[in-house]
């Protein structure tokens, strides 16, 4: 008789499988990042980071002329060292309104932009802390002001 795992453990295993599939579409060094943050983050957090990083690399390819001829898998840490604060501010602007790979409109408000920039900050901090990046422009980017939600009574 096989023992069934508790729900949260089943979900964790599903999320690990999903993360492994997602990392196959990201530059190889991203796997190191996910391994490095694994002890301090949940699988759902790492999946959200993987999604956010894929949006970032797509932005670089679509919107930055320096990287326009590159594929997502071809990015290296040396390329990340070339990113400036201005590039990241342009990324924040891009996040407000864009089209995804299925040509669907995507709109992000402050909260969504903050999450994506926070993911990027964690990503840059990890590689800066491990001395694989010389620069950390993400540390210099200010997060958008979060407007409080109305209280409905």
Task: Please provide the spans of the model-predicted regions.
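N-terminal core-binding DNA-recognition domain of tyrosine recombinases/integrases
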Residues: 30-44, 54-150
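N-terminal DNA-binding module of tyrosine recombinases/phage integrases
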Residues: 1-47, 62
